[in-house]
Amino acid sequence: MPAAVSISQEILKPHLEIQGGHTLSRELKVSGAKNSALVLMTSALLSEGPLELHNVPQLTDIQGMADILASLGVRVKRSQETVWLQADGLHHAEPPYDLVNGLRASFFCIGPLLGRLGHAKVPLPGGCRIGARPVVEHIRGLKALGAMVKVEHGVVTASVPGTSRRLKGAAIVLDCPSVGATETILMAAVLAEGTSTIENAAQEPEVQDLAKMLNAMGARVSGAGGPIITIEGVERLHGCNYSVIPDRIEAGTFLIAAAITRSIVRVSPVIPEHLNAVLQKLRDCGCTLEIDKQGITLIPGDLHGVDIITQPFPGFPTDLQAPFMALLTTAKGTSVVTEKIYENRMQHVAELQRMGASIRLQGNTAVVEGIPQLSAAPVSGNDLRAAAALVLAGLAAHGISQVDGLNHLDRGYDEIETKLNASGAHILRHQPSG
């Protein structure tokens, strides 16, 4: 009789094999914020001095950004959670397409390059395909600062006219509180001549983190975290040592992992104020939260459905919409999840349905009817947060699930299976050769 072929051998793609039904315990460690670290790294372009970043997550996106900066002439060194950068030999203002194609954050280079060199040529970025996510607001802000910008054949070319090659301060009102546009304009404006204001600015913690580090480099930024940011331009910045804030999305993912497995788990380090909307929804679901200065302990209860509407910070974050939906699939009653930020961020619904979830999709709204337990299935994460949601679903499902899409997952989670396994999960990573 031929040997039985395991389910995992049938999947040729790299994937996680998750044995569901195990409770978690102990503490889950949160890495530095990916969305903050990426933009902080590009800030190295603004100064000749050395920038030393600590608490940097070890992710494929971080390496991608390091490669992009190196291609521009930045010296880059990495050692575990520390990244050292120095742009004293900055000689190039056009990152190559093959490096920027898979990383949306690559577009953050345009603001610092304009501010420092007076010109930049940056291909339109890649990343998760969860919607248009245009750069119109970024470009409009750069034009307001005096840059000449054109978009041609998928490449954005920008330059500062005149002999000074220096941007001019301006009052900018964003049509929507875009995080990327706010950060791009902020980095461009710190070396501009005069004062700039950004109204309807994004208030996300990552914007606050950027402003704090820029100030440590000698910038004069005030109001970050509110709707109006003021930037008094300076002639030059210097290097600094800086520690990236904890990743609020990873922290939220781990809290949801505790809830979906009905486990008591402590998650740290966390800045609770960065997760207020998520913490409230967990309480509304029936969870108890014990919060201190260093972390949050989740104690599950009899979970029931809640309604979720994604909003810009301080509202419920779009990056936790998919993971929270996974939780709601096994919560009693009906939940309604509405995605207001991106128009194509429901790709996880079909995969959750493969695991037995009862979900009706109506445009960007999902109606979830809770069931007692999900069933294991082979599923595919088509974007970063969808992949995370499926990992959580696998933890709670009966049987052994296989989750592929690790190229997405590894962009945003630092050794997620290692951390979950240390807390009691049973996850194997399969990386087929050839």
UniProtKB/Swiss-Prot annotation:
Phosphoenolpyruvate binds at K34, N35. The keyword Signal does not apply. It is found in: Cytoplasm. It is an enzyme of class 2 (transferase). InterPro entries: Enolpyruvate_Tfrase_dom (IPR001986), Enolpyruvate_Tfrase_sf (IPR036968), MurA_subfamily (IPR050068), RNA3'P_cycl/enolpyr_Trfase_a/b (IPR013792), UDP_GlcNAc_COvinyl_MurA (IPR005750). HAMAP family: MurA. This is UDP-N-acetylglucosamine 1-carboxyvinyltransferase. It comes from Prochlorococcus marinus (strain MIT 9313). The lineage of its organism: Bacteria, Bacillati, Cyanobacteriota, Cyanophyceae, Synechococcales.
